[in-house]
A protein has these predicted regions:
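N-terminal secretory signal peptides that target proteins for export/translocation
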Residues: 1-10
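Generic structural signal for short, flexible, solvent-exposed coil/loop and linker residues
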Residues: 10-15, 215
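Bacterial N-terminal signal peptides
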Residues: 13-24
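Bacterial Sec-dependent signal peptides at the C-terminal "C-region" and cleavage site
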Residues: 23-33
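Mature extracytoplasmic or organellar-lumen-exposed domains after removal of signal/transit peptides
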Residues: 31-326
């Protein structure tokens, strides 16, 4: 029996003097333990669906935001405020504010190389409708002055970073690539996963499983909510087949063999890459004292199987208890 006690547990770790969030989830399971790939065997269960889709798994928007986060961090570290032609601020804001509707927003990290070729070159190849700003915590951050929201705080730091070469303010001890990255991981990625999709959207009345997520969708409300939370976690779909070291090396673009699960010679940045919180979990787990990466990923796989097994019907109270602690 799968038991997931709470998805909103956080482990705080200091990374370069900045708080780094690592999602920790407590789960034990004996049933639904045969699958090792996220998204495996998830048929379309929406009643009355007449389209051509056969797989209900979808978290493209979340992977696009993982790439925007990676790219934003990269461009912050390359800022040249002394060069008036560099347009540093607008480039940074582009990766935070905008959606890649025209498939012209270049993926800056990971970039393709001979040792680690990647399938996609533009963010819009995965999703044309995603940005970071629109998903940032909109509540006032009491720890910051002037009633700034989460999105406001990130913009504030971006503006500061645009005025500093390489994004590091040595005089005031501010490493903006790290500050912006870690704050974005919390205010966007973690916030959306744990305070939205695994919280409100796992209650009975919110995005019910007997209805499509939205009109015409090929996935149910609960199926897609769960998938979106998994996307914000940032693990490759085949993470359960990897060691923590391999998952870490995939994030560092050092292990093509481990990343290329389908053996087509390139890394699919939608399903085969390690990002964000899953990357930090991999880093911690390499020492052998923790098992965050597989604990969380396995619980996501098992929870999705419970939702899929409902076959497009409402989740029972027992199902809801398993996937969400009231």
């Amino acid at each position: 029996m799968l038991k997931i006690n709470k998805y909103s547990l956080i482990k705080n770790a200091a990374v370069l003097g900045v708080a780094s969030l690592s999602l920790s989830l407590i789960a034990t399971s004996s049933s639904f333990s045969d699958g090792h790939i996220y998204g495996e065997n998830n048929p379309v269960t929406v009643k009355g669906y007449k389209g051509s889709k056969t797989d209900s798994t979808a978290y493209t928007g979340q992977m696009a935001r993982q790439l925007q986060h990676n790219s934003l961090k990269k461009i912050v570290s390359k800022g040249k405020p002394s060069d008036p032609t560099s347009n540093t601020l607008n480039k940074m804001l582009n990766y935070f504010e905008n959606k890649d509707k025209t498939k012209s927003m270049a993926i800056l990290d990971p970039k393709s190389s001979s040792k680690f070729p990647v399938k996609q070159k533009m963010v819009g190849e995965i999703s044309t409708g995603s940005n970071l700003a629109g998903k940032a915590d909109g509540r006032v951050q009491l720890s910051w002055p002037n009633n700034m929201t989460g999105a406001d705080v990130i913009r504030f730091m971006i503006k500061k970073a645009s005025k500093i070469s390489g994004g590091v303010d040595m005089r005031n001890g501010m490493n903006y690539p790290q500050l912006i990255s870690k704050y974005t991981m919390g205010a966007v990625l973690y916030h959306q996963a744990c305070d939205n999709y695994l919280d409100e959207k796992m209650t009975a009345s919110n995005k019910p499983n007997d209805k499509p997520y939205k009109k015409g969708a090929y996935y149910t409300g609960k199926e897609h909510s769960w998938d979106e939370a998994f996307g914000y976690w940032g693990a490759a779909a085949h993470t359960m087949t990897l060691s923590a070291q391999q998952s870490y090396d995939v994030a560092k673009k050092k292990d093509l063999k481990a990343a290329d699960f389908n053996k087509d010679g390139v890394v699919d940045l939608y399903k085969e890459m390690t990002y964000g919180h899953a990357y930090y979990a991999s880093a911690f787990d390499r020492g052998g004292k923790t098992d965050y990466l597989k604990t969380v990923t396995k619980a996501f796989i098992d929870g999705r199987k419970i939702i899929t097994a409902a076959d497009g019907e409402k989740l029972t109270s027992s199902d809801l208890t398993k996937v969400h602690e009231p």
